[in-house]
Every structure is written in structure tokens, then in C-alpha cells.
């Protein structure tokens, strides 16, 4: 039986402001060297705590790929691999111990590599992952639980329809629980996706 997360597409494309974004499935062992490199970058270590030897990470990501409550993606910007994304089913995740998770709720963990950080892409990447979820599932709510010290989410939440729900104490961190509701997200950000789809359709007409 196909689970909610595994039913998400293997590839999803998006664009904003003449920049192309995409999500593609993680492929092992092809992507292992990239994942090892990213997990050892200084800005990623404190949040992910996966700065482990390559063999340990190979086993870790194999297990992650076999876990049917989540879907692993590589984030691409203009065709370049620049980040990692996990989409997970909140009801079947430990997060369900900390809030009243609904069956269709989907959550995320995301990172951008050091060469993509600070380049003005994070809002678009966050909108892309929400469009992926809302366009290809029945989720009425997307959830996130970043470390409360990650101030970037507070800075951009108004631009991506994130609503803070308060802090929760996980084993390894104090997290800020965020909800992103489908209706509000499309009211606020839907025009981005409409613009992308229109430009894509126009391009197809020209090419044909």
C-alpha cells in the first residue's frame, strides 16, 4: 500500500523571479557524497547533529529511504544540487507526541548547503515544499519544528504563511512548532504558483 509520503512525486519543479527550483528523489549511493559533505558543514552540524563517518551516514540514509512514513529529496536551484529535504507524515512521527496531529498532516526538515545560504533563496524553497505538499496530497496543514534558535523562520514566516504554535521540548532541542494552513497559504502565496504555471504553459506553446 502506497503511503501518503511515498505517493508524493519523485520530481517537482517550481520557479520564482527567473530562478528555477526543483525537488528530486534522493538516490543512493549516488547522492551519499553530497549528503556527507553537507552534514559536515559548520552551519548544519548544530541543527542536524549528523557529522558522522561516511559509513554511518550510508547506513542512516539507507534506513531513512526504507522508512515509508517519509520522502527524501535533493533541493535544486538552477539545476544544481544545493540542499536536502525530508517530508514526513506527522501522525506517524514522534512529533505526534507533542501536538494533536491529523492523519494527513505532513512535516518537513530542510537544509541548504553553504553555497546557497544567504543568497535569497530560502523563501522560495519553503514555498516550493508547501506547494509540493498541497498540490499532491490531501494535507490541510504543513508542520515544522525547527530549533527555536533558528531565527530565520521568524524572519520569513509572514512571507510563507507559517504560524507559530509555541515551543515544544524534544529530546535534543527546544523547537518552535509551526503550522502552515492550506487555505491561508494559497490566499497569501498562491499567486506565485499561478505565475509559474502560466509561464510554463506559455513556454510550452512557444516551443510547440
Swiss-Prot record:
Gene Ontology biological-process entries: siderophore biosynthetic process
Catalytic activity, EC: 2.3.1.316
Top EC class of this enzyme: transferase
UniProt keyword list: Acyltransferase, Transferase
Gene3D superfamilies hit by this protein: 3.40.630.30
Pathways involved: Siderophore biosynthesis
SMART domains reported in the protein's UniProt record: AlcB
GO molecular function: N-acyltransferase activity
Catalytic activity: N-hydroxyputrescine + acetyl-CoA = N(1)-acetyl-N(1)-hydroxyputrescine + CoA
Family: Belongs to the IucB family.
Described purpose of this protein according to its UniProt entry: N-acetyltransferase involved in the biosynthesis of fimsbactin A, the major siderophore produced by A.baumannii. Catalyzes the acetylation of N-hydroxyputrescine to form N(1)-acetyl-N(1)-hydroxyputrescine (ahPutr).
The name this protein goes by in its record: N-hydroxyputrescine acetyltransferase
Organism listed in the record: Acinetobacter baumannii (strain ATCC 17978 / DSM 105126 / CIP 53.77 / LMG 1025 / NCDC KC755 / 5377)
Lineage of source species: Bacteria, Pseudomonadati, Pseudomonadota, Gammaproteobacteria, Moraxellales
Gene name for this UniProt entry: fbsK
